[in-house]
Amino acid sequence: MRTWVCLVASYIFYGWWDWRFLSLIVFSTVMDWWFGLWITYHDAPEETRDRCENGSPGLRFFGRLTRWAHGLQLQRRTILVFSMVMNLGFLGFFKYFGFFADNLAALIREMGMTPSWTTLHIILPVGISFYTFQSMSYTIDVYRRELSWEPSLLKFATFIALFPQLVAGPIVRAADFLYQMSEDKRFDWNRWNSGMGRVLWGFFKKIAIADSIAPFVDQC
């Protein structure tokens, strides 16, 4: 239940800015999770197949899809390349396509010609750099056999979309996060008091110290 709450809250938070980009992060999440499954299937096909068949209906579906894809006889490295091309392709299109297209059009106009295309004003999805590299790091770690494939798409999606770090970072490695979602978390007053103490101390330094000396620093 806790994981569902975190995931739904994260998607609401992300979609509040522009719901159209929810499809992008969901698609990237599902594909990279499946690429991790596909890579793992190469190493242990029988164990992975049994794990999928004994799982949820969604896991059984992706298990059968992976068995079909495995018949294509693609190498593990090729699957990793698929993942990287997809992720970097999305990132490059949304973040850099408009920049290069506008500059190329300006250069052509300086040469006395008229560009034959209309430059696109592409909106940059919030946090695309963070969740792209975070998702890629998972696939790369699975490929290097430094991390086991995560059988729960729910946990993996929460790892990618968790709203506290989605739009401002830092980029979190799957090995440092996913195992925590399986731990039994209990409310702890000592941790609460310690955390609130840090928050209040930060407010004090910002309001009482930083804001007070800011006018003098600006004049220097």
Where are the model-predicted features located?
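Membrane-embedded transmembrane alpha-helical bundles that form the catalytic cores
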Residues: 1-220
